[in-house]
Amino acid sequence: MSHRWKFILACTLLTTLPQAAYAWNSVGHMAVAKLVYDRLDDGHKKKLFTLLQSHPHYERYLAAGRPDNVSEVEWAIVRTSVWPDWVRPRGDKDSRGAEVTRYHRPEDHYVNVPFIDPKDAAVFAGKTLIDPDLTNILDALKQRCNEVRTKTTADIDKAIAVCWIFHLVGDIHQPLHNVAYFNDTKDYRRGDLGGNLFGVRAGGQRVKLRAYWDNLLGDDSNYADDSANHQARIFREALKVADSLRGLQLADAEQKKLADNTTFKSWSQESFELAKCVGYRQSDGKILAGVPAPFKGPIPEAAPEVGDDYIKTARATAEVRIVLAGQRLAERLKLVLGK
């Protein structure tokens, strides 16, 4: 057995134990949403669709650009999953205005759980590395689910909350959205922001580790392209991914996760363990080689290659996480929407 598979097996054992009580890109998020859509009964689809028609961006985004061969119900529901990324500010050239970007909640997409390089454990022992009062994806998911459950919540707010639930359940299953890597160097003493400051090469391409994982399921290099042709292409790519994963047989360990891990915290803990055991590990089990990368700007030329074994393992891990996200999100939606 290779060193990498030994680490994956160790992670599987860890994450199946009882837990103390930019995420996938558009392709990945919409693939999760499509898997969810196919698991919902007609009654829940109708209830979701009715709610979404109260959304402030229903005509402008959720229903916009629909291809002729896709029903409005399916198109709108699947696109809920990427709306929270669509409202992100796009810099000085963003002409959409505050009517769109006012809904942006940057801290809601992730939680920075510290992963300390084992060789530096003594350096960080006893230190508070992440402000415990910062809001994060766990808080956001609880709040949005409660908003949908509460009868007095206005339909417009429920529609917005539904979009966040679709998106954040996808995010919480992306390992790099649940971690921050620390080591005793000037570049990582405050963490790497979930791989956003960690540069590598994958297949010869320089990329931040976070972005590499976000893009594992498909390419959406021009996320700001709102044209109907581009959005239809992304939708088709997502359907291909969903179709390829629909018949994926989960291993017994993953089936046990579905049965045992039913809380947002337990889903995040699964992702954190995978980040430690797969996301930041080389094929020999050592911490992944990488170089400090600027949050904005080019990846340094010195970025090392992750290797074919890492690429294959990362892809396989992402596929399982997408399937788990789809099944869990479908069940959670049934719970919060009611009969």
Report the location of each language-model feature.
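Bacterial N-terminal signal peptides
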Residues: 8-18
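Extreme N-terminus of proteins, especially the signal/transit-peptide cleavage junction
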Residues: 2, 19-23
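Bacterial N-terminal signal peptides that target proteins for export
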Residues: 1-8
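N-terminal, motif-rich segments that launch catalysis or mediate targeting to/interaction with membranes
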Residues: 22-168, 175-339
